[in-house]
Amino acid sequence: MGQKVHPIGFRLGVIRSWDSKWYEEKNYAKWLHEDIKLREFVKEKLGQAGISRIEIERAANKVKINVHTARPGIVIGKRGAGIETIKKDLQGLTDNEVYLNVVEVRKAETDAQLVAENIATQLERRIAFRRAMKKSVQTALKFGAKGIRVACSGRLGGSEMARYEWYREGRVPLHTLRADIDYGFAEAKTTYGKIGCKVWIMRGEVLPQSAGARAPRTTGGARP
């Protein structure tokens, strides 16, 4: 039976970069747990802002946090008051100096994490799961996605037995490394229990960065 590889982890170093960009030998475990705490705090504090991903860069006792959000206005607040409050709270979680940067997500409809969270929110509001899934598929294709797959698992519609349902439109080639596939996961906390929502979105094809930098191979022949 075939198993699913995480689409983003599978493409790291080929067409995708890491969300944590730093190198450390002695304090690796400390920094890793610190990154987890920073991400969890931002997600909890800015739950309504539509957070797609959080990038963390470290260099010379400085931590730069890039928050990719669909609603930058909620993060920044009136005259930048919101961002200063969050920055102050984040400073208490780390010994290093914190720099907070807000990056706007232009097309939230083709961002897998935001689509998954949107479906989860609709399920919590008791909207029919088939309707929520089909609407997300149609919207993503309308905004330029080449293909999309949406899957929900759990006690769908309040049924006694948990099941797995999915819809797919267009191309979603999970084994093609040059395929720019975005993946997102969210959980809907309903009265019947948790429902998992997974989304795969194919946004096009990207040539691997290493392919362009690689020197052309020469065949053996007479010496010049």
UniProtKB/Swiss-Prot annotation:
Keywords: Ribonucleoprotein, Ribosomal protein, RNA-binding, rRNA-binding. It comes from the Bacteria. Signal peptide: none annotated. InterPro entries: KH_dom, KH_dom-like_a/b, KH_dom_type_2, KH_sf_prok-type, Ribosomal_S3_C_sf, Ribosomal_uS3_bac-typ, Ribosomal_uS3_C, Ribosomal_uS3_CS. Binds the lower part of the 30S subunit head. Binds mRNA in the 70S ribosome, positioning it for translation. PANTHER family: 30S/40S RIBOSOMAL PROTEIN S3 (PTHR11760), SMALL RIBOSOMAL SUBUNIT PROTEIN US3C (PTHR11760:SF19). This is Small ribosomal subunit protein uS3. The gene is rpsC.
